[in-house]
């Protein structure tokens, strides 16, 4: 008699515990985790091209001393998939060994404000 009441309760407990386990989400993997070498990333927006002029000037100057790194730079026109790292565009970011080592975001007045931090990282 007691088994008739216990058996259905055990089935319900196992069924409900299986449901809660299936709702656990795996840890979200960042796109930075896929970058294992020094990589320059530039996030651009054609609607804000006037804000990007110092970035382009800085990149042209940096290309003289670091042509290989600038040539391998990746340019994105959307921040889709990068929301955890990028708040606004334009953004110039240097990633090394899955870590952001330099990030310059938003409106920058002088190209030197971009060149100096990048030179520091790229010269290593």
From Swiss-Prot:
GO cellular component: plasma membrane
Lipid sites, type N-palmitoyl cysteine: 19
Domain of life the protein comes from: Bacteria
Protein name (record): Pal-related lipoprotein
Membrane disposition: Lipid-anchor
Main localization, broad class: membrane
Native source species: Bacillus subtilis (strain 168)
UniProt signal peptide: 1-18
Keywords from the UniProt entry: Cell membrane, Lipoprotein, Membrane, Palmitate, Signal
Lipidated residue numbers (S-diacylglycerol cysteine): 19
Protein localization: Cell membrane
Regions annotated as coiled coil: none
Keyword Lipoprotein: yes
């Amino acid at each position: 008699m007691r088994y008739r009441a216990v058996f259905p309760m055990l089935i319900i407990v196992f069924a409900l515990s299986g449901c809660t386990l299936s709702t656990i989400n795996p840890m979200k993997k960042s796109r930075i985790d896929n970058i294992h070498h020094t990589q320059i990333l530039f996030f651009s927006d054609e609607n804000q091209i006037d804000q990007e002029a110092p970035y382009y000037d800085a990149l042209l100057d940096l290309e003289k001393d670091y042509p290989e790194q600038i040539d391998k730079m990746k340019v994105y026109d959307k921040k889709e998939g990068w929301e955890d790292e990028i708040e606004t565009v334009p953004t110039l970011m240097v990633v090394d060994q899955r870590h952001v080592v330099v990030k310059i975001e938003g409106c920058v007045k002088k190209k030197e404000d971009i060149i100096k931090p990048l030179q520091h990282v790229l010269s290593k």
